[in-house]
A protein has these predicted regions:
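A short loop-to-beta-strand structural motif that recurs across blades of beta-propeller domains
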Residues: 56-59, 112-116, 123, 169-173, ...
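Short loop/turn segments immediately following the C-termini of beta-strands
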Residues: 53, 109, 166-167, 243, ...
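Gly/Pro-rich loop segments of beta-rich domains
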Residues: 2-36, 66-92, 122-149, 179-226, ...
Length: 434
């Protein structure tokens, strides 16, 4: 397609797409252009639900692999509570938890809120947060409390909702009977929101910054360092993804004793084939448990998916070589590269694992064969093809060269790409996506 001729025929104020397919549903998910898929769970009906952090939506992938819009209209904002989730607006939705009834709890990170989608009705409601960044509200209603980077959410069998506060380094709990919120684990830090919307420590007695201590004692007095995600096992114990301590920790909810189950605190990724507590993990940023209580962990900077066997306590790598990259398609997990794994990971009973990585895809590890495939986001960015069919993931800066070539910073695909004005073909001129 000769773009120069198309431009000549444009009328005033007309819009003409020259690159990118945008947000499409009703097509095979593996052919869709996703933004940044993070949280992922399987619904009781068998469909997969995927959070798209970048495009402010939640997707549904049906059993035939077709992609459907599930919640959100794709425009960043905060609206729609007490109405259909499909009409709601989110801002950088992050983590996702499904309770035993199929209800979904969502960390709407950019809005500093926790929201719930009813399984039967599809209605979305506010669970916690005023939208203000901060730490206040303990002892009062959760919907009147401030949130400070509450990435992780988990719900126990009794309906109590647990939130991990990444920047205040503790865990809060919401009582389902009265809606009150309190801090239950981790020393209480006092913070205030900065001009940039981040949380900074406020000097004074009782201040607790991130750290590592407390194993073997009460979780109430334990030190966490950016606890990001939470999950319960079949016995009701709470697992904490203690990100910057490079550990996964477990809280016995009967005794409230905390221990480490994976990671020795070294900033590395090794120890496969040995005890998980002697191994190292590099910034764990996603955790889940299967029905057998096997633990699965995604490493943000180790670029791996690791598994800890419940029966033996031994750890091994399922996917990843330790080198970041777009990742090979259809190969065994042992030779397939991962990009950073953040927030989203889910495991079926047979050990099949789904996760989102920062290449803009949701991927699948087959628990029987070990083969890795892409289920959402495409296996290619479609270089050397017509730009209108190309995948752009967070296009940023744009410039036109003296020869008419259009240059685009394809941010999340980690490339600089050029569009030929005479052929309409897009190609990468810098960056490999790694």
């Amino acid at each position: 397609m000769d773009l120069t001729e198309s431009f000549k025929t444009l009328s005033d104020k007309a819009i003409f797409t020259i690159a990118g397919v945008g947000q499409r549903d009703g097509i095979p998910a593996k052919e869709a252009d996703a933004g940044w898929p993070l949280g992922v769970v399987r619904r009781p009906d068998g469909d997969l639900i995927v959070v798209d952090y970048q495009w402010h939506r939640i997707w549904r992938i049906d059993k035939d692999g077709i992609l459907h819009a599930f919640a959100g209209d794709g425009i960043a904002g905060r609206s729609g509570d007490d109405g259909p989730a499909i009409e709601a607006r989110f801002c950088n939705p992050h983590d996702l938890f499904q309770d035993r009834h199929g209800h979904l709890y969502l960390s709407d990170l950019g809005n500093n809120t926790i929201r719930r989608i009813d399984y039967e009705t599809g209605v979305i409601t506010l669970v916690a947060g005023t939208g203000q960044v901060g730490r206040g509200g303990d002892g009062g209603l959760a919907i009147e409390a401030e949130m400070d980077c509450s990435c992780g959410v988990a719900v126990d069998e009794a309906g109590y909702i647990y939130l991990s506060s990444e920047w205040t380094n503790n865990i809060r709990r919401i009582d389902p009977k009265n809606g009150l919120i309190e801090t239950v684990f981790g020393q209480i830090a006092r913070h205030y929101p900065s001009e940039q919307g981040h949380s900074r420590p406020f000097a004074g007695s009782g201040l607790s910054l991130g750290g590592y201590h407390g194993d073997g004692g009460s979780a109430k007095e334990a030190g966490f360092n950016h606890p990001e995600h939470l999950v319960f096992d079949s016995m009701g114990n709470l697992y904490v993804c203690d990100n910057s301590n490079d550990r996964i920790r477990k809280i016995d909810m009967k005794s409230e004793i905390i221990t480490t189950v994976l990671g020795n605190g070294q900033r590395a990724s090794n120890g496969d084939g040995g005890p998980a507590i002697e191994a190292s993990i590099l910034m764990p940023d996603a955790i889940c448990l299967d029905v057998h209580d096997n633990l699965y962990v995604g490493e943000k900077y180790g670029f791996r998916i690791r598994k800890v066997e419940h029966e033996t306590g031994m750890v091994r790598t399922l996917v990843g070589t330790g080198e970041p990259g777009f990742g090979e398609e259809g190969l065994h997990g042992s030779v397939t590269r991962c990009n950073s794994v953040e927030a989203g990971i889910y495991a079926d009973p047979d050990g099949t694992v789904f996760w989102g990585d920062c290449s803009g895809r949701t991927r699948r590890y087959d628990g029987q064969t070990g083969i890795v495939t892409t289920i959402l986001g495409g296996t290619s960015v479609h270089d050397d093809e017509a730009a209108v069919g190309g995948f752009l993931n967070g296009p940023g800066g744009l410039s036109v060269g003296p020869d008419g070539h259009i240059y685009v910073a394809d941010v999340w695909n980690q490339r600089i790409r050029a569009i030929d004005p005479f052929t309409g073909i897009i190609r990468a001129i810098a960056g490999s996506g790694a």
